[in-house]
């Protein structure tokens, strides 16, 4: 991947988030979230809007980047997985007829081969009329690559 980029996003396009103190973690839920403790964070600048398909397309055009959803999976990383599960794709939201058991995400998310930021509902769908919609099907690694190209970084917990 080339990191040819337009340079840092100008500060006049960002909003300032003031620093402060917050309570991080929890003592009441999962052990790995504890112990709860106070954390001081410095102020920072943040993009006030979601990244659009248009902006993400500019990044992909400039770098040749392929998202996680566009890359096939390596069978060696998933021994015994059926080959049809190793094709590029992503999970697509499926509207339910009513309330469902939230412990079973397959009731409202469907693995869709070919779904990606370019094809949000899978093959046959496109972003042609959605240039200014928020980009979807972007993994953390994809967001990191976009942020680095834009001269920024992703926010962290603290």
Where are these regions (language model features)?
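Extended beta-strand/loop cores of jelly-roll/beta-sandwich
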Residues: 1-158
């Amino acid at each position: 991947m080339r990191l040819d980029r337009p340079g840092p996003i100008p500060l006049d396009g960002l909003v300032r988030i003031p620093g402060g103190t917050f309570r991080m973690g929890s003592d009441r839920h999962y052990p790995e979230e504890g112990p709860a403790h106070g954390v001081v964070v410095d102020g920072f600048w943040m993009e006030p809007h979601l990244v659009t398909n248009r902006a993400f397309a500019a990044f992909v055009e400039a770098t040749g980047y392929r998202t996680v959803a566009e890359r096939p999976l390596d069978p060696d990383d998933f021994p015994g997985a059926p080959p049809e599960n190793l094709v590029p794709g992503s999970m697509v939201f499926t509207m339910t007829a009513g309330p469902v058991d939230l412990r079973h995400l397959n009731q409202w998310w469907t693995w869709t081969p070919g779904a990606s930021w370019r094809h949000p509902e899978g093959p046959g769908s496109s972003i042609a009329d959605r240039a200014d919609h928020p980009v979807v099907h972007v993994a953390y690694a994809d967001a990191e690559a976009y942020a680095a190209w834009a001269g920024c970084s992703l926010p962290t917990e603290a």
